[in-house]
């Protein structure tokens, strides 16, 4: 009561009509804003943010002409020290504090866990050389063949590259592959020998290999130790002198290439861009050449090494932008797309973009809990924003429910994606073993690429309608010490390989080229190769051709009913080994039933291997007198008939966790 009286006195003392300047929402009629009004308000907010006084960093960047820009990347084989060298360069230019840094540009959890670079990461640095500031843009690229699409995209924003070689290991397979990729893009290459302070280092041998393999001028080569920082200070003057400045004009209409994108839970889709002409500020209205959709820029900035807002990004620079309002769908951010300002569409020629890599390894992914399907779909879409080389199709399985058919560039690519799903999105998934696509040539002239066992022709169609089936082959390049030559040749031959060439590029190092089926390559070929050579071999591969092959569908049957989640497309020579492995492993995870459970591996009507799970046996003779033989026989016959009837009508109950355990490695 006392509270009500106090409230009444407060209301009577308050003004009867609030001042319009203080309470616009109470005195005026409700206002409804149109979408265009919201966009204009967002643009005004962005322009207000852009009009703030520039920071010291911005002032230094603004004073640097495009002639003093240098865009470069570091390319090398896996584990030759790219990320560690990047750390030293960032410390040398004052971008990060020295001493406590370890792979600053490896930002993903999976990269730090595995010690490999998965995503190409960028960073802007300012370097003072001979009294003048230079704007350096560094890209740390992956070394593994599965992430070559990342490397080739990085080259589009660079004018040169540091070709890094480990002094103790020398030139290896992916060094060769990355060199030819950079050479084809016309990049200026600077040879760098790393890890020269190791006891096993042979820098002169590594230099000689680079000279013989690539015909590079090694007089300008720099000998460094990225770990200790030895001679790293000699690298940047070489970069400034040897790598050309980017070509661009700030006065021309904006022409900007989308190089990469990722998702931020607060800002939405963030785009990494390379500006070729013109300049871009917050508040500008842009249009995409690929989709025709228009956006207002919410913020622009550079990676220094993290997102650092700026007033403007000019021609020749690489930076990030995000839109306000953001993109409605993540698929709007198309890698390789060209953007310009609204009104300049006719004056600007779109850039050629990137060639999309083809997925060559396919797996099926299902949520462990069927209720988490939508969460898994959202997680996959967000990761695809950051990795456009993945292909996705929805599919369903009777055993595992709704899921996805995912396509990857290789087995490591698949494994890293699975780790990122679990770590970054908390998604629990079941992944089927990797398989490769096959090409079916029908007798009526049609060609069909089959990526899922469910779409593979059945036995009757194979006989009557299919002309031939082809599988993809790759040209694999293997480098290793010559003492392991016999073991490596034996491994390649046992995996249906055909030798193409054998050469020595030093007295002890061999380059061996084999044509191998892609299906054998994804079946842990690299692990077997490392085992045969005590870890000294390196592997690189490129697509070769489709070749006619004896391909069949291997199925797992439980009481003659096929289990669709386990079916695989394999070569005929593999069916016996794989079939026996399947039935033995699956038997371990199937619970005993009241009737006999028969597990078979079959190709069409032909059974390859079989295991039986014995039923529970009820003791029907427990209460019977030992001497009553006829009664004993009658009870056993009745039990036998009951089992037959149960086997005929009973369904085998296989727990979801049984599939999860079977499909896990």
Curated annotation (Swiss-Prot):
Domain of life: Eukaryota
tr-type G domain location: 67-247
Membrane topology: Peripheral membrane protein
NCBIfam families attached to this UniProt entry: lepA, small_GTP
Name the UniProt record assigns to this protein: Translation factor guf1, mitochondrial
Role summary: Promotes mitochondrial protein synthesis. May act as a fidelity factor of the translation reaction, by catalyzing a one-codon backward translocation of tRNAs on improperly translocated ribosomes. Binds to mitochondrial ribosomes in a GTP-dependent manner.
GO molecular function, one term: GTP binding
Keyword presence, Nucleotide-binding: yes
Main localization category: mitochondrion
Annotated family: Belongs to the TRAFAC class translation factor GTPase superfamily. Classic translation factor GTPase family. LepA subfamily.
Cellular compartments per GO CC: mitochondrial inner membrane; mitochondrial matrix
Enzyme superclass (EC): hydrolase
The keyword Cell inner membrane is assigned to this record: no
Gene Ontology biological process: positive regulation of translation; translation
């Amino acid at each position: 009561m006392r509270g009500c009286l106090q409230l009444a006195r407060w209301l009577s003392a308050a003004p009867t009509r609030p001042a319009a300047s203080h309470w616009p929402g109470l005195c005026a009629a409700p206002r409804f804003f149109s979408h265009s009004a919201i966009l204009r308000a967002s643009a005004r907010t962005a322009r207000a943010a852009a009009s703030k006084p520039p920071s010291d960093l911005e002032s230094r960047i603004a004073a640097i002409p495009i002639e003093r820009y240098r865009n470069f990347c570091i390319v090398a084989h896996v584990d030759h020290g790219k990320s560690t060298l990047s750390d030293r360069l960032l410390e040398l230019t004052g971008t990060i504090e020295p001493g406590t840094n370890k792979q600053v540009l490896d930002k993903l959890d999976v990269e730090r866990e595995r010690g490999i670079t998965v995503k190409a990461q960028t960073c802007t640095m300012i370097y003072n050389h001979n009294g003048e500031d230079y704007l350096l843009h560094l890209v740390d690229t992956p070394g593994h063949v599965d992430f070559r699409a990342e490397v080739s995209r990085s080259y589009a924003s660079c004018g040169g590259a540091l070709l890094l070689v480990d002094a103790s290991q020398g030139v290896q397979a992916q060094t060769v592959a990355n060199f030819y990729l950079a050479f084809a893009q016309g990049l200026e290459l600077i040879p760098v020998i790393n890890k020269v302070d190791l006891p096993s280092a042979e820098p002169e041998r590594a230099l000689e290999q680079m000279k013989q393999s690539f015909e590079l001028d090694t007089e300008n080569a720099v000998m460094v130790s990225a770990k200790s920082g030895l001679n790293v200070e000699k690298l940047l003057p070489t970069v400034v002198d040897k790598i050309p400045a980017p070509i661009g004009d700030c006065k021309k209409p904006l022409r900007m290439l989308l190089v990469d994108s990722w998702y931020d839970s607060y800002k939405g889709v963030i785009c990494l861009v390379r500006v070729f002409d013109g300049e871009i500020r917050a508040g500008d209205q842009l249009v995409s050449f690929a989709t025709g959709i228009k956006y207002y820029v919410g913020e622009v900035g550079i990676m220094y090494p993290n997102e650092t807002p700026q007033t403007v990004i000019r021609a020749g620079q690489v930076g990030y932008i995000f839109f306000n309002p953001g993109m409605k769908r993540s698929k709007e951010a198309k890698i390789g797309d060209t953007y310009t300002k609204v009104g300049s569409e006719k004056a600007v020629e779109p850039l050629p973009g990137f060639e999309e890599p083809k997925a060559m390894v396919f797996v099926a992914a299902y949520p462990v809990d069927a209720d988490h399907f939508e969460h898994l779909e959202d997680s996959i879409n967000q990761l695809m924003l950051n990795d456009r080389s993945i292909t996705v199709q929805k599919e369903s399985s009777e055993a595992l429910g709704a899921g996805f058919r995912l396509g990857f560039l290789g087995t490591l690519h698949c494994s890293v994606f699975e780790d990122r799903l679990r770590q970054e999105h908390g998604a629990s998934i079941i992944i089927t073993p990797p398989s490769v696509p096959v090409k079916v040539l029908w007798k009526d002239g049609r060609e069909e690429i089959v990526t899922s066992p469910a779409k593979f022709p059945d036995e009757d169609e194979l006989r009557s309608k299919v002309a031939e089936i082809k599988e993809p082959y790759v040209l694999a390049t293997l480098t290793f010490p010559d003492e392991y030559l016999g073991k490596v040749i034996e491994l390649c031959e046992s995996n249906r390989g055909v030798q193409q060439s054998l050469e020595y590029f030093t007295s002890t190092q061999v380059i061996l080229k084999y044509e191998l089926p892609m299906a054998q390559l994804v079946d842990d070929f690299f692990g077997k190769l490392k085992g045969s050579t005590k870890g000294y071999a390196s592997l690189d591969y490129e697509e070769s051709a489709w070749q006619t092959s004896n391909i069949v569908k291997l199925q797992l049957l439980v009481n003659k009913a096929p289990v669709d989640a386990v079916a695989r497309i394999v070569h005929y020579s593999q069916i016996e080994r794989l079939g026996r492995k399947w039935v033995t492993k699956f038997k371990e995870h199937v619970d005993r039933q009241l009737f006999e459970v028969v597990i078979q591996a079959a190709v069409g009507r032909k059974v390859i291997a079989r295991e039986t799970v014995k039923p529970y046996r009820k003791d029907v003779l427990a209460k019977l007198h030992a001497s009553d033989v006829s009664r004993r026989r009658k009870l056993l016959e009745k039990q036998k008939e009951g089992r037959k009837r149960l086997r005929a009508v009973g369904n085998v109950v296989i727990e979801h966790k049984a599939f999860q355990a079977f499909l896990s490695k």
